[in-house]
Structure formats: structure tokens, C-alpha cells
């Protein structure tokens, strides 16, 4: 894995890795054990920061979101996570049962499968906005969440004389990249290009692109290489 030597180098130098994900808390907790990562983490597209058992919220509760969606149901055709069981979420996402259960364990957002026209979707998004919420179009889902984004929590984490480096490859990463001191666009697979200005850009995709750019930045800051052998 090209990422592991970079993570070891960061760990030895005291450079924390703070994950900022669209995933749920349950999903990230299942993943981070393999990395040995105990840093704060941001979930559900900037909706909350968890630091141990402490939580700082930037979005609104899923209960409030579902309540707001009730009044829109008669006018629009959509189906959300809250309307179905784990088997259907497995079909929608291609996830195995345990992973689908973690994906369903949401506190600050509701993914919708849109079943209406594009024109209706635009109208729906406007009405959601009027209710103090926002929509975020992902690959498969239209996500409804509070008025937050991946950039807002970065201000909460900001410390004096500390540079924030952010790396991402999708539209929902843009606010985070713009809020960071150093924003890095990781090349996306296929023909998709994230439109962003004054950003560093990788030549590789995915984890290789992440490792490429973090190595470049650590070299720039003269962070020493790890003495750990990943053999």
C-alpha cells in the first residue's frame, strides 16, 4: 500500500491525520482500527467532529431532517434510507450486510434515491433550502443535511502556526480544499476533473495520488523519512 510509508512518516513527525469523510461515525470507526488512528475525525460531509466521546456538531439532527422531509413527500417521488431496511440498502450500495448497517447508522443526514424528474429535483432542492437544510448530489444518492460542508469544521480545528493540508477528488471536497492552507486535488479516475483554482494537483489517482502529493508536501516542509520498515 503506497499510503502506509507516508502515514508512518507523518506519525513519527507528529503530523496528525484527521479524516474528513462523507461516511458515518460507525463506518469510520470500523476502518480506523486498521490504521491505528486515534485523531479527531469529521463525518457525514462536515456535520460533526468527534474527538473521543466529545462531539461538536455543525449540521442538524437526522430527526429534524426527516421531519422536514415529511411535508415534501406528497409532492415528490423519492425513497430514503429511513424508508427501507438493510437488505434494500445493500442492493442500492452493493455493500455487505455489516457495512450497510454502519452506513444506515446516520445521525446528521438522509440519503435519498430520487425517483422523479430532473425539474422536480431542482424544485425539491429549493424547498429543502427554504427549510434551512441543503442537498448534496452524490453518485447514487441525493443527500439531505444541515447547512454545513467539509470546510466548516476546519475552522474549529485551526491552531496558530499550524498549516492545514487537505486532499480530495470530488465536488463535496471543494469547500474543504478551499478552507485549507494547502489544498490538493487528487486526480479522479476517468475523465472527471474537479474545477478548482490555486490548488496543487496529483498526477496519480486514489491512494497513489494521495501518497504522491503528501510526500511532495512533507519534502517541502523537510519532514524526515520514517525509520519504520513496512517490508
Predicted regions and their residues:
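Mg2+-dependent phosphoryl-transfer enzymes with acidic/Ser/Thr/Gly-rich catalytic loops
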Residues: 1, 139-231
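Active-site phosphate-binding/coordination module
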Residues: 1-83
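Residue-level detector of anion-binding/catalytic polar loops
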Residues: 16, 134, 182-183
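Short, charged/polar "capping" segments at the starts of alpha-helices
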Residues: 28, 120-121, 191-193
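Short low-complexity, flexible loop/linker segments enriched in glycine and/or proline
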Residues: 32-36, 113-114, 151-152, 200-201
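Short hydrophobic/aromatic-enriched beta-strand-loop microsegments
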Residues: 38-44, 98-100, 183-188
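Conserved acidic, metal-coordinating active-site core of Asp-based
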Residues: 72-165, 171-172, 179
Amino acid at each position: 500500500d503506497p499510503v502506509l510509508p507516508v502515514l508512518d512518516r507523518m506519525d513519527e513527525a507528529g503530523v496528525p491525520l484527521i479524516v474528513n469523510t462523507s461516511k458515518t461515525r460507525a463506518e469510520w470507526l470500523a476502518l480506523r482500527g486498521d490504521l491505528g488512528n486515534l485523531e479527531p475525525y469529521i463525518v457525514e460531509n462536515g456535520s460533526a467532529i468527534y474527538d473521543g466521546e466529545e462531539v461538536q456538531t455543525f449540521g442538524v439532527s437526522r430527526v429534524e431532517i426527516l421531519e422536514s422531509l415529511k411535508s415534501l413527500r406528497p409532492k415528490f417521488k423519492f425513497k430514503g434510507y429511513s424508508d427501507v431496511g438493510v437488505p434494500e440498502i445493500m442492493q442500492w450500495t452493493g455493500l455487505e450486510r455489516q457495512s450497510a448497517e454502519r452506513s444506515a447508522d446516520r445521525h446528521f443526514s438522509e440519503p435519498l434515491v430520487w425517483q422523479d424528474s430532473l425539474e422536480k429535483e431542482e424544485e425539491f432542492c429549493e424547498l429543502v433550502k427554504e427549510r434551512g437544510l441543503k442537498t448534496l448530489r452524490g453518485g447514487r444518492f441525493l443527500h439531505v443535511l444541515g447547512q454545513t460542508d467539509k470546510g466548516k469544521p476546519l475552522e474549529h480545528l485551526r491552531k496558530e502556526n499550524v498549516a492545514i493540508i487537505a486532499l480530495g477528488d470530488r465536488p463535496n471536497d471543494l469547500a474543504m480544499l478551499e478552507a485549507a492552507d494547502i489544498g490538493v486535488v487528487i486526480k479522479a479516475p476517468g475523465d472527471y476533473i474537479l474545477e478548482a483554482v490555486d490548488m496543487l494537483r496529483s498526477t496519480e489517482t486514489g491512494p497513489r495520488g494521495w501518497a504522491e502529493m503528501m510526500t511532495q508536501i512533507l519534502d517541502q516542509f523537510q519532514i524526515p523519512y520514517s525509520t519504520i520498515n513496512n517490508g
